[in-house]
Amino acid sequence: MTKANKIFKELDLFIYMLLLCYMLVDCMTGFLRIKGLPGVSQPYKMLLMLLMILSLKSYIGTVIYFFFFGIISINLIFYFFYSYTSFSDSLAMLLRIVMAPILFIYLKKQNEKEPKRFLNIIKFNTSVLFINLLLGLLGFGGSTYENESALGIKGFFYDGNALAATLFAIYVLWINLAPKNKVIISIVFLFFGFLIGTKVSVFSVLLYFILWCFFNVSKRKRFFVLFILILCISVLVYVLLQTPIFQYQIERIKWLLKLFKGNYVSVLLSGRNLDLNAHYEFYKTNFSIKEFLFGFGFLNFRKIIELDFFDTFFSYGLIFFLGIFGFYCYCLYINRKNKKITIFNLLYFALSITSGHIWFNSQVALFFSLANIIFLDRGKKINETHFASYKHVSFKIKSDLRYFCKTNL
């Protein structure tokens, strides 16, 4: 092994260690913010991005990285001179949205070299997620809805909406990876989705489970299975609607109907369509080729729309939007033969159009990327048993850490 190859191998090992701590760092950031201290998530992820870029020895990957960071640099130069743009927020959100393509490019390369590490990353981060939510159940951390009702649990994670999307992506990984007990896995994730208490955390898991079952049985039995599932889930939803958190959601819907004068679109989107109209009016008033191509950043006098699809276009312009949109279309294309992952990608895309903290969510980026990589066989043939041989793999954190310390300290 050459000296250069040894350095790259140790660098990949260090990145692997950082990825094992992915959710733990977000959890620490939430804890620090509750205490009024600055978080550690942003510098950690900036370091992770830099190391992944340095580690990648791929011409195509380098071109893609150059494209994203070239556009980001041009955007930031313009935003610096805009009086109506928050430069720091624009930079922070840019780094969040490019996390998914950077992770995807790096992990796709690692899938050819060290795919067994992926399962350890999923296991460890899932454990952190569950332990955190259980601690929230015991009264530690914050609530999903920080008001007088204090309903929902998010533990020490800072953003309930981002946490809901992350739970959904991790659920998709486990239901497709686990060799058995898929119904039990679904019940466990539904339980934790209920603890979080958002529409996304509960209904994304429910809807995916219904569609997963529908496509997992023979065509002859599909509609019978669908009927049974809808019947069981209707009973479950009825029970859920009697709980305080969903009673709160019902009262909130009634309040929104009154606020928006019976406009069901506004109620469904929690008024985000009105924010979309306001941003569109500002866009029309200040339109120029420069804003069309590079956007106007995150406005310092108006909150974001929280519809990621539209926020990306208005904030960062057509060129950057096409890059991000192209990435998600590529993920959909390469997994087109795998109906279960295609369903996930379509639901994920639908969430980005109807809600926020999906594309602009660096927390879920890792698990979205893994879901779109681990079921591929060289990008052509779907191999659904790709992880069957890994079910007995134990954690090698201790031996990996010993090797890293021995060679570097």
Which residues make up each language-model segment?
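Hydrophobic transmembrane helix bundles of membrane-integrated enzymes that assemble
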Residues: 1-253, 284-290, 302-409
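Flexible internal linker/loop segments at domain or repeat junctions
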Residues: 246-266, 295
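TM-adjacent membrane-interface loops and short helices in multi-pass inner/ER membrane proteins
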Residues: 262-303, 319-320
